[in-house]
Swiss-Prot record:
Membrane disposition: Single-pass membrane protein
Spans within the Extracellular topological domain: 37-69
Predominant place of localization: host cell
Residue positions with a glycan: 51
Keyword vocabulary terms for this entry: Glycoprotein, Host membrane, Membrane, Transmembrane, Transmembrane helix
Compartments in which it is found: Host membrane
Lineage, opening ranks: Viruses, Varidnaviria, Bamfordvirae, Nucleocytoviricota, Pokkesviricetes
Cellular component per GO, a single term: host cell membrane
Homology family: Belongs to the asfivirus X69R family.
The protein's name in its UniProt record: Uncharacterized membrane protein X69R
Coiled coil segments of this chain: none
Organism in which the protein naturally occurs: African swine fever virus (isolate Warthog/Namibia/Wart80/1980)
Intervals, Cytoplasmic compartment: 1-15
Superkingdom of this protein's organism: Viruses
Keyword Transmembrane: yes
Length: 69
């Protein structure tokens, strides 16, 4: 479901934003890929995915604890 929302928003943005702003289009393509990969994971792998992503973006060791019941 989240993937479809991101794809719809990306399509709307691609129609509204001129082609000169290719970075915005690239951002949404990357977001679609990230959401697609995220939805293929199970609940425990999702927390590891965000730990890795956030630590890569911030440059610091980020730990999100999983409270899966």
């Amino acid at each position: 479901m989240l993937l479809y929302i991101v794809i719809i928003v990306a399509c709307i943005i691609s129609k509204l934003v001129p082609n000169e702003y290719w970075a915005i289009h690239l951002f949404f393509i990357i977001m679609i890929f990230m959401v697609y990969m995220y939805e293929k994971l199970d609940i425990h792998q999702k927390y590891q995915f965000w730990n890795y992503t956030m630590s890569g973006l911030s440059g610091h060791n980020v730990q999100i604890t999983c409270k899966c019941y």
